[in-house]
């Protein structure tokens, strides 16, 4: 499916369907008014019949409108003009796709005027990403009857010709971000018998082939991990026949404008049984999503390469599998991490932080200025923030504010939580430097406190996406979060101007 940007006369467009907005009390948008005048009031006469009120959720398909070359016009209700926000706008777009999917419509022109949710850049970007999200379908394994959408092209009509350049920039960014989100979803949704740590390393190596001028990949296998002293990482994978692999993706842009080295680390537990501290059977199948952090980092690096961002970005996919076996690590073990710090294991289901701590230490060799780890780390974060908001922790206020700003821009909600010294005390151990879980409450915070002990040499932030990375139930599947937020963070670091 292709997207296009242009400024056109709607009555002259030979297309299958033109989509225009109608507000409450049957108030027409400027685009609808233009088509109404061209058709000698045909649209107004039909609206007077009362088939559409302009409320959000309303749609009305018109056929063979006089003096209009398009085969159809879809009127879509947008509610009250001054009450449209990002959430309602996404719902409006979803309603249009729902109405169009029922028809054999291949080519569409959207002409949304009088919707002032933001400047033209953000309006176009939100439109493209929302439409793409509405059209996304999970790939079924070995399904020969894949039903793709009938839609071949979507054209976004720009009312003011002066806005064409920025609109085309928005489209370029949106398509790259969608590529990142879709790649993240597709990888996250794979079953664990396909997507194991070795498979993650293959996916990383594919990037170095596709973007050979900008991306170099190094794979750290268990032999190299042993040489590096990554004992915590290794211990987590000891119970599985699928050995751990850490994929290091190095992206170097052309004409770099920001000299900072930015690094992302993604938790890549391709399946987490909990180990000896085994999880309950109910919902254990969803633990294939415990690698969504790594998938998000993978997707974000794709966007950087697609847009040729003028940055240096490192992405680590910390691939591992936590299984029960005769070689599994145990509660009571004491592990010496790559940093030299020792950890008492109180719970083998608190394994993600053990993989991440050695990955965070490994990153020191690159002298990064910014490190952001992304992990489905704790159920406690889901308890605290629910399934709509990710947890944010950081040792640097400026970095925290930059991520919060990107969150507001993308409507990918995050919430900052503290790392007070009182929480660190919960990790005290009598036999090691600290334990791998807290002995009290605030599990999301104590997990972040654990990670912070390995991030003293750079500015660091931790995103706990345990509640937001996937959805359960009838419409289960990966959400692709927080990829757009991370992409926006990189765009902001690239000093892009959107107005």
Swiss-Prot record:
Key word Manganese present: yes
Q: Where in the cell is it found?
A: Cytoplasm
EC number per UniProt: 3.4.11.1, 3.4.11.10
State its cofactor. Mn(2+)
- Can you supply one Gene Ontology CC term for this chain's record? cytoplasm
Query: One biological process GO term for this chain?
Result: proteolysis
Coarsely, its chief localization is cytoplasm
**Catalytic center residues:** 279, 353
What does the record give as the reaction this protein catalyses?
Release of an N-terminal amino acid, Xaa-|-Yaa-, in which Xaa is preferably Leu, but may be other amino acids including Pro although not Arg or Lys, and Yaa may be Pro. Amino acid amides and methyl esters are also readily hydrolyzed, but rates on arylamides are exceedingly low; Release of an N-terminal amino acid, preferentially leucine, but not glutamic or aspartic acids
Broad EC category:
hydrolase
How many cofactors are bound and how? Binds 2 manganese ions per subunit.
Ligand binding (Mn(2+) 2): 267, 272, 290, 351
UniProt-listed Gene3D superfamilies: Leucine Aminopeptidase, subunit E, domain 1, Zn peptidases
Q: Name one Pfam family in it.
A: Peptidase_M17
Q: Which residues are involved in binding Mn(2+) 1? A: 272, 349, 351
Keywords on record: Aminopeptidase, Cytoplasm, Hydrolase, Manganese, Metal-binding, Protease
Q: Which domain of life is it from?
A: Bacteria
Q: HAMAP family, from UniProt?
A: Cytosol_peptidase_M17
Sum up the protein's function in the record's words: Presumably involved in the processing and regular turnover of intracellular proteins. Catalyzes the removal of unsubstituted N-terminal amino acids from various peptides.
Task: Tell me the protein family, please.
Answer: Belongs to the peptidase M17 family.
Protein name, per record: Probable cytosol aminopeptidase
